[in-house]
Amino acid sequence: MAIMVDPPNGMGNQGKYYYSMWQTLFEIDTKYVPIKPIGRGAYGIVCSSINRETNEKVAIKKIHNVFDNRVDALRTLRELKLLRHLRHENVIALKDIMMPVHRRSFKDVYLVYELMDTDLHQIIKSPQGLSNDHCQYFLFQLLRGLKYLHSAEILHRDLKPGNLLVNANCDLKICDFGLARTNSSKGQFMTEYVVTRWYRAPELLLCCDNYGTSIDVWSVGCIFAELLGRKPIFPGTECLNQLKLIVNVLGTMSESDLEFIDNPKARRYIKSLPYTPGVPLASMYPHAHPLAIDLLQKMLIFDPTKRISVTEALEHPYMSPLYDPSANPPAQVPIDLDIDENISADMIREMMWHEMLHYHPEVVAAMSAR
């Protein structure tokens, strides 16, 4: 539970209350009443809370010492810039970023999201039964949210069950945009680490430089297979093992299936693997609907140029009971996520401050009145 505590050194800041959760100090705006901690990760701690002004339940994520690690700081800044623009019922909503007291020296960031009950990883590993309707509805919502992102030229690049939040109504929302980039970006971001290995597309495993939205579709296919089978389809131990597991299921590739590989060494490796006929997905998931298997096969195609797109997946017969094209408008404008990777920590801090101002017009008004 959240325990109210005295401020550090007995010196509290106006407009802030202090709470201890899991031996971590939270300095949060007085309008929020924390309930209990609900999650912990490398980034920090998440607690559930109530907004006194609206009576709405929210999730507060504290990112501790965000500037200690430059990569984490840039990830956080990108997520703030992106979520300010995104408005879709299958994408998590960032409702507030708490203003720190000291503009030039703050170390922690407090993000306020809509509150969800669990995530798809927890559901998959639970004993709770999942019907065809459950699997279909989760996949539909994931594809809807992803179609919206792709319409804004955004690649998520880290889709996995743990990044898909779910509530008691089975509503699903995509979260964690720290690795997201614009599809138009070129250069160094294309070769850096992306996507948790088990959900990583072949073109990433093979170090192809020019990838696009199809990497997210592969991840969706892996997630859908995990929903159907209640375990990861390709639980590789390292990169080469990951490729072997994929080929063992899909079967040995034809010459035309390898044309997209622009790395000669990578192409030689795939060709060196022993011949395998593959394993029919219908035999791996014998209880799945035949149309579900057909769609899964189209998402898990080795060659990204032949893989189904998000829009095509939504138009697949398996989705026809749920999909209404007129109810899925695209994002309004493409979003610019390009940030100079070499900017100083002070500049990242200043850019975060300006992102916070979008949620606090009262601070902007006070600054203008000076």
Swiss-Prot record:
As recorded in UniProt, its EC number(s) are: 2.7.11.24
Supply the SUPFAM superfamilies for this chain: Protein kinase-like (PK-like)
Protein kinase domain location: 32-319
What's in the keyword line of the UniProt record?
ATP-binding, Kinase, Nucleotide-binding, Phosphoprotein, Serine/threonine-protein kinase, Transferase
Q: Provide the positions where the record notes the PTM Phosphothreonine.
A: 191
Which one of the record's GO molecular function terms can you name? Answer: protein serine/threonine kinase activity
Q: How is its activity regulated?
A: Activated by threonine and tyrosine phosphorylation.
Protein's GO biological process: intracellular signal transduction
Q: Where does ATP bind?
A: 38-46, 61
- Reactions catalysed according to its record: L-seryl-[protein] + ATP = O-phospho-L-seryl-[protein] + ADP + H(+); L-threonyl-[protein] + ATP = O-phospho-L-threonyl-[protein] + ADP + H(+)
**PTM Phosphotyrosine: at which residues?**
193
Q: Where is the active site?
A: 158
Family annotation (InterPro entries): Kinase-like_dom_sf (IPR011009), MAP_kinase (IPR050117), MAP_kinase_CS (IPR003527), Prot_kinase_dom (IPR000719), Protein_kinase_ATP_BS (IPR017441), Ser/Thr_kinase_AS (IPR008271)
The top EC class, named as a word, is transferase
Which spans of this chain does the record mark as coiled coil? none
Modified how: Dually phosphorylated on Thr-191 and Tyr-193, which activates the enzyme.
Q: Which residue numbers does the motif TXY cover?
A: 191-193
Pfam families reported in the protein's UniProt record: Pkinase
| A Gene Ontology term for the protein's cellular component | nucleus
Q: Which family does it belong to?
A: Belongs to the protein kinase superfamily. CMGC Ser/Thr protein kinase family. MAP kinase subfamily.
User: What does the record say about domains?
Assistant: The TXY motif contains the threonine and tyrosine residues whose phosphorylation activates the MAP kinases.
Name under which the protein is recorded:
Mitogen-activated protein kinase 3
Top-level taxonomy:
Eukaryota, Viridiplantae, Streptophyta, Embryophyta, Tracheophyta
